[in-house]
């Protein structure tokens, strides 16, 4: 139905009164249907002052409203009763967190394990600040490590230290000659095979 703004306002008033009767007056389904019938019975050409608020509806529109209430409010009346009357448990969703402050190092308990703690948290709250003595020890250790590496590198012998330039040249020439000789031999063998194959073909052509 295409209701006007005033008709929509009256319809919402009627629906609010039905819900008020259900929630506040605890009307049963039968009483609500009876009350609605009394209100709608006054709608028409000969309406009385009792239903003055709802005389904006025609009989056809009133029947459409009744049909709608049948499939909405009245069909689910028990559900609305449960909604208004039944007490429901209030569920409060929340979380509780217990935060333990890290005890000082001189406390008679072992320090907490570092596993499971992020590096930022450990560096900010747990790791002790370096003292000048500790910083000097770290620098000395780093310098000692670098000096040890340099000494070990200097002690390593050069694998070519016992050879002269002439020795290296002669070794390279010898290796080069061996490689070239093997390649020449392989090429000669392949050429010989091809030559024999060509000769055989020439002999066949002569005989033909």
UniProtKB/Swiss-Prot annotation:
Keyword annotations from UniProtKB, A to Z: Calcium, Cell projection, Cilium, Cytoplasm, Cytoskeleton, Flagellum, Metal-binding
Pfam family, one: CLAMP
Tissue: Testis-specific. Expressed in spermatocytes and round spermatids (at protein level).
Compartments, record wording: Cytoplasm; Cytoplasm, Cytoskeleton, Microtubule organizing center, Centrosome; Cell projection, Cilium, Flagellum
Positions in coiled-coil regions: none
GO CC list: centrosome; cytoplasm; sperm flagellum
Transmembrane segments: none
GO biological process: sperm flagellum assembly
One of the record's GO molecular function terms: calcium ion binding
Biological role: Calcium-binding protein. May be involved in the control of sperm flagellar movement.
Protein name per Swiss-Prot or TrEMBL: Ciliary-associated calcium-binding coiled-coil protein 1
Organism: Mus musculus
Gene: Cabcoco1
